[in-house]
């Protein structure tokens, strides 16, 4: 197909910084219309995308039977954060991290806390094009120890992650993904190949919740968590956003903890965080501190060693305690680490995590 001034449409998209996507294949059809459809294989949604259309995530588009990654380098929200904000409590504590995202998401969470980015339909209005080299330079210039792919769902801009994370590692920086974990087996090894740590958002522990409130499936997320913890060197922590009346049932929390203990470890850090009314779920109250601490108590009583609360100010529940003697090792207030923290307790216990 030709466009104005004799440009081929594929060449035009490449000039506009939209590279051909990595994970897709053409759909073999029985008529001319189906010949131009493509199957995206990046996430378990497996979108079948017609010519000129986008996938569910918004930033992957079919042009003349070729799938393009239209979010490549279109950065939103470039900012320096404390790493505890991700949240990661056992990965380079007290360091700063350069964070960014793009438009779009491969889930449809009705409670999305970043909907102004994940649900945007014209990313050109709020994004700026930034090269991988520029991102790494900004991180180094600001004294950051790592780069976070976050805010929306980074899986959907996996091609860009690979380029940035490779350069970051070469320059001595660590790489962090804050992710919903909704990715296929075909894509995950490439996307995570240079990732050092991940916080996976385990949104609930029922298929009903995932189906009705996120338009996705729980089992695919659990498979990613198991793979990350058992088959990679990625440091992993989990976050569970507790939403009143939807996933705050004590028995659901017990089921989730049992699964973590059976499939991962009692030393996997777990963050229970507070929901605030947003997007399509503004009719619900904020999560109470008592609810968060109740979930934390259940998890600790079941044997989890590192359980935290978030989105509330509670130094006690945000402090890291020695699993052996219960003394404080890393004290925090909100996202700040109080000085004089230690990685080896006075009793001799060495804290699990990545610290250099």
What are these regions (language model features)?
Residues 16-51, 245-356:
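Auxiliary Fe-S-binding modules of radical SAM enzymes
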Residues 2, 10-15:
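Low-complexity, intrinsically disordered or signal/transmembrane-proximal segments
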Residues 56-66, 71-78, 122-135, 336-346:
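Short cysteine/histidine-rich metal-coordination sites, predominantly Zn2+-binding motifs
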Residues 109-113:
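The canonical Cys-X-X-Cys-His
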Residues 132-287:
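Conserved AdoMet/S-adenosylmethionine-binding subsite of the radical SAM
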Residues 84-88, 107, 127-139:
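Short, charged beta->alpha transition segments
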